[in-house]
Curated annotation (Swiss-Prot):
The gene is astE. Pathway: Amino-acid degradation; L-arginine degradation via AST pathway; L-glutamate and succinate from L-arginine: step 5/5. NCBIfam families: arg_catab_astE (TIGR03242), PRK05324.1 (NF003706). This is Succinylglutamate desuccinylase. Its cofactor is Zn(2+). It comes from Idiomarina loihiensis (strain ATCC BAA-735 / DSM 15497 / L2-TR). Keywords: Arginine metabolism, Hydrolase, Metal-binding, Zinc. GO terms for biological process: arginine catabolic process to glutamate; arginine catabolic process to succinate. It is an enzyme of class 3 (hydrolase). Transforms N(2)-succinylglutamate into succinate and glutamate. It catalyses: N-succinyl-L-glutamate + H2O = L-glutamate + succinate. Belongs to the AspA/AstE family. Succinylglutamate desuccinylase subfamily. It comes from the Bacteria. Binds 1 zinc ion per subunit. CDD domains: M14_ASTE.
């Protein structure tokens, strides 16, 4: 067995911007492994179930816990320790940023999907890689067996800063479609009891899959950024176990839906950095989901003051150093789970 399959992550990192060759391996249990590119592995059971599952990591290369989880699941599949019932596509999205140990090399990849990679005059390898990721997702979903099928995409991340709600997921804008009760239960089984509802289209990987392919797709934040080997894997055990169950079991049983177990937030404000002189009005170590009250100053964008518009307005993803025109701060307010349009 060559290095492609003996150590898929290491081989991927050796080919950080891609590999033109493809590789195939059929396991003794009949499962077919197809490597389409560095970091791109399709797993096809001999008799696939009705689900098509995309598991992506390393859109940001320093978010190592999801990379370790995907690495271990892949290794166990190859060693035939992990059964696979449903077609699964693993994507290690940005290997060059893994090697650099940084969030990205030149540009934030999670702002480059839904065709954003081709807009404007800027061109770089991250944009090229994002375009390839889109193509691989399309190829995977479009090559599924005929019949009634369900599509899933969980884009796994960890956050830069601490969070008062350690694990949370971003539910892409649904364009008026109802939310999935079963997906909230799946996330809860992963240890993710907090969900943020996007209120508009975005250029994230999960929104791309949701919008273009009607997939159940989420950006899943599983904790905080740590270097390789320093993640407390016990904190990620529920997520890893549930992801393993997703690809191995025909159906998952979550029991009755209990709204009070879920903490749901919707966007209140998106504050973009439009001026070079942008400053957040709180310390760098203030945690995600810290609450502010109406009228409290959140940031200065040049000479424009940005205030909280609601009592109980929580901050998410503050980053004063983003590129001009990008989001520097998101704020959210809680909404009752019972108020959602759920199916």
């Amino acid at each position: 067995m060559n290095k492609v399959f003996s150590d898929f992550l290491a081989w991927t990192r050796e080919h950080e911007w891609g590999c033109d060759e493809s590789y195939n391996l059929t396991l003794s249990n009949g499962t077919k492994l197809s490597v389409w590119d560095s970091g791109v592995l399709e797993v096809s059971p001999a008799s696939p179930g009705h689900k098509d599952v995309v598991l992506s990591c390393a859109v940001h290369g320093n978010e190592t816990a999801p990379i370790e989880i995907c690495r271990d699941i892949i290794n166990d599949i190859i060693d035939e320790k992990q059964t696979v019932t449903h077609r699964t596509l693993f994507l290690i999205a940005n290997p060059a940023s893994i090697n650099k140990g940084e969030r990205f090399v030149e540009e934030n990849m999670n702002r480059l999907f839904s065709g954003e990679h081709g807009k404007g005059s800027t061109q770089n390898k991250e944009r090229e890689r994002a375009a390839k990721m889109e193509n691989y997702v399309e190829r995977f979903y479009q090559s599924a067996p005929e019949g009634s099928r369900e599509r899933f995409h969980y884009d796994l991340h960890t956050a830069i800063r601490d969070s008062k709600r350690e694990k949370f997921a971003v539910y892409p804008f649904t364009h008026g479609a109802p939310y999935s009760r079963q997906q909230l239960q799946f996330l809860l089984a992963c240890g993710v009891d907090t969900v943020l509802l996007n209120q508009a289209p975005t250029t994230t990987f999960s929104y791309f899959s949701a919008r273009q392919f009607n997939a159940h797709a989420f950006t899943v934040e599983l904790g905080k950024v740590r270097p390789f080997g320093e993640n407390d894997r016990a904190k990620f055990a529920a997520a890893e176990t549930t992801l393993r169950d997703l690809i191995s079991q025909t159906e998952l049983d979550f029991g009755p839906f209990e709204p009070e177990q879920h903490y749901v937030f919707k966007e209140a404000q998106t504050i973009n950095r439009t001026q070079p002189d942008f400053e957040l009005n709180f310390a760098d170590d203030v945690a995600n989901f810290t609450s502010f009250n109406k009228g409290e100053l959140l940031a200065w964008d040049g000479d424009k003051a940005c205030y909280a518009q609601h009592d109980g307005e929580h901050i998410i993803f503050p980053n004063a150093k983003v590129a001009l025109g990008h989001r520097a701060l998101l704020t959210v307010v809680r909404v009752p789970t019972e108020s959602l349009d759920l199916v």
